UniProtKB/Swiss-Prot annotation:
Species: Drosophila melanogaster (Fruit fly)
Modification Glycyl adenylate, positions: 90
Keywords on record: Cytoplasm, Molybdenum cofactor biosynthesis, Nucleotide-binding, Phosphoprotein
Protein name, UniProt field: Molybdopterin synthase sulfur carrier subunit
Pathway named in the protein's UniProt entry: Cofactor biosynthesis; molybdopterin biosynthesis
Post-translational modifications reported in the UniProt record: C-terminal thiocarboxylation occurs in 2 steps, it is first acyl-adenylated (-COAMP) via the hesA/moeB/thiF part of MOCS3, then thiocarboxylated (-COSH) via the rhodanese domain of MOCS3.
Record-level GO BP terms: Mo-molybdopterin cofactor biosynthetic process
Length: 90
């Protein structure tokens, strides 16, 4: 990801299928301090091999769901980002 401005380290948490595909429960990534949710999602999908579930992922920034992928996200050092696929079960 090319960032023209300042960047910060963000903790990424993976759940369910995203954890399986990323092959890790957590990671740290460097992201711009301001980015759209779509740009962020595209970067994470590419970096962690989540293409097969991209269209079904939910993102949460510091435990708040990101409802609109056109929203701009403002990150601070050490923020948390959760990648949550839809859960299934019975």
């Amino acid at each position: 990801m090319n960032a023209d401005g300042p960047v910060v380290n963000v903790h990424v948490l993976f759940f369910a299928k995203s954890r399986e595909l990323a092959n890790t429960p957590r990671s740290t990534v460097e992201v711009p301090t301001e980015i759209t949710a779509t740009e962020l999602l595209d970067h994470l999908v590419s970096k962690f091999g989540l293409t097969s579930i991209r269209d079904n992922l939910i993102l949460a920034h510091n435990e708040s769901y990101i409802d609109n992928l056109s929203d701009r996200i403002l990150f601070k050092e050490g923020d948390e980002l959760a990648i949550i696929p839809p859960l299934s079960g019975g």
